[in-house]
Amino acid sequence: MSNFVFYDFETSSSNKQWGQIIEIGAILADDELNELDRFESKCRLSPGIIPEAMSLIVSNTTPKRLKETNLSHYQMVRQFVEKLKSWRKVTYIGWNNLDFDQLFLRNTLFQNLEYPFTSTTNGNKEGDSINLARAANLYYPGTLKNRTNKKGNLEYKLDTMAPLNGIEHAAHTAMGDCLATLEIAKIIKKKAPSVWEASLLTANKDESLKTIKNEKLFCTNEFYYGKVVSFVQTFVCQHPVYQWPKTFDLKQDPNIYMNMPIEVLKGELKKSPKVLRTCRHNKHPIIMNPSYIDNFEEYKMIGITKLTERANIVRKNKKFAEKVELILRDEAEEKAETKSQEDLYEEETIYNFPPTEDNKILPGFHEAAWDKKLAYLQKFKDKRLQYFGKKLLYQEKPDLLSKEDYDEIHGTIVKRVLTTNDEKKWNTIPRTYAEIDTLREKFGKSEETEKLKMLEEINVYVEELEKFYSHA
């Protein structure tokens, strides 16, 4: 069994491409979830990054801390990368990390001239504890204690779940959230062991796909509008463009759809409830065997015998799968034709992969002395890597840049942070002022004096940034 890395980030923004990690917490644990090692670090805010006020308030990160921390962002990232390398092949786990922390990590590594997909390649895997927690309570009710919201649904917020489950929790600190996630995993492993074991089979997308294809029928759950919804499904085909497994919901009678003309089928597949579902194999689906159908009333009424018959009908009908593939391909092509053709910024191009030769020489940039790094950048064929390298020099050793390079980078930053165009994707000074005004009114009404005090500190900090960039 492999070890696990539980990790969490606090960030300057909710934007994974334009924000910055400002605090890292990570714990290495063995297969029994005993702690073996840990990494904890904070850093300064990099030039050109304008923080979102609410992000700082949630993580209780003061402007003073952002300005005076010894480590730069690049230095913190380098230390974290070296620690991860020393931990070797592991399964990464966070809390809602597949929709947040993982994406932040990938973009951070990409923009710091590191291979971005380290958590899911070279023998590494990645799962998500929030998926585990929802599945554990679905298959083994009461595994975890949750607060119920006004709509009567269970909440899966780490800061409320931890104390309810007897976990001491320094909420919204990277290490505090890390420790809480680890403790929740221990509860699941103990009280819902079959869910825990099943989750280990789908933390790798290739293994997940294999399970989906090989199981005649299986149970999964999805999260919609605050509710965990269960399904019993069987594999139909992979999406011909996006490669996601498409599955048939077995509460529907497949005989209705198997021999439909393709144009009729196309219309039927758009109706709700969906006959055809997407089982995102790269998002750590928790896949359970059909013995659990008694947990789901709709499927229990149909019965395992009938569900198995339906699965056999779907899986044997190759023409149905071919028609579905044609429909999906047409839809994808239509979508591509209407997709915006606007140019992407370098920061938004993580999935445009650099040449293999460039990936091989990435480590040399970090190994080179600072006064050698600029020359080293010329080895990269990919202009984006040269751009990111110059940005790192601007942030760390601006005096080593030529006046032309410095003026170009600094001028771009000034335009970005001062723009009043609210459609821009990065955070700006005017946008943060507007956010502060909104929060000031909100916290004033709720009489949250500590948050109001911190808000004023953030406002002063943003004024300092505005003064600096306005006189650049």
Go through the PLM ranges and name each one.
Residues 142, 191-201, 217, 221-224, ...:
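Intrinsically disordered or highly flexible coil/loop and linker segments, enriched in small
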Residues 1-114, 160, 165, 172, ...:
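Conserved non-catalytic scaffold segment of RNase H-like nuclease domains
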Residues 91-96, 100, 104, 142-207:
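Acidic, Mg2+-coordinating catalytic module of metal-dependent nucleases/exonucleases
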Residues 44-59, 63-67, 124-178:
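Active-site-proximal helix-loop-helix substrate-binding element of RNase H-like nuclease domains
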Residues 115-123:
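Short mixed-charge
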Residues 47, 135, 188-191, 253-256:
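Short loop/turn segments at secondary-structure transitions that flank enzyme active sites
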Residues 201-280:
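Acidic catalytic cores of enzymes that act on phosphate-bearing nucleotides/polynucleotides
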Residues 11, 45, 98, 128-131, ...:
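Short, flexible loop/turn elements at secondary-structure junctions
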